[in-house]
C-alpha cells in the first residue's frame, strides 16, 4: 500500500506538496517576542535542511534519481552523503518542513500539513527502497545494513567533506528552484512577523522580486546551455 502511494506521490509531489505549504499562511500572525524567537529558530532549521540538500547535490559522484517521474537509478550511489544516510535529500526536505512549521507556528500547518508531509515522504522512501531492492538485490541489502535510512551517521563525515570535490555549478543548476522556494517562504514568514507599515512591505516585495529574478536568470542560462552541471566523475 505504501509503495503504491509512494509511486503516485513521486509522480505528483511537485504539484501536490506546494499546496500543503499554503497552510503556513492561514490565520493571522500575532507579533510577539515568542513569534520572533520561533521564526529565528525555524529559519535556522530550514536553512540546515537546505544546506543538507546543497551538500548532497554538490559532492562528486552524486546523481539524483528519477526518470519520467518514475523511481529510477542507473547505479546504487553509496558515496558522498549517501555513505552516511540513505536519503540525505529527503532528510534535508524534512528539516525544511519542520523548520517552516516552527517558524510559522501555525496550527493548520502543524496539525494537518506536516503529518501529511511525513506520511508522504515515508511512502516515497518505501517506493524507492522497493525499487532499489529489486534492481540491486544483495548490494542494496548490504548498503541498508550499514547505512541509516534518515538519521545520518556522523562518523567519518569530516573525511567525506575533505576528500570529495564540491561542484557549485551543479548546485546552482540542480538546486536553484528549491533554494528559491526556501528563500521565498522565509521572506513571507518574516514579513508576517516584522512588517508593520508600507515601507516594510516594499522591502519584502523587493526581496521577493530579486529572488524570483535570480531564479529566472538561472533558468534562462540553464535552458540556453550556457550553464550546466558539468561532468559527473
Question: What are these model-predicted stretches?
Answer:
Residues 85-86:
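Conserved SAM-binding loop
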Residues 1-82, 95-233:
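Membrane-anchoring alpha-helices and their flanking helix-loop junctions
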Residues 90-94:
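Conserved beta-strand->loop/alpha-helix structural units within folded catalytic cores of enzymes
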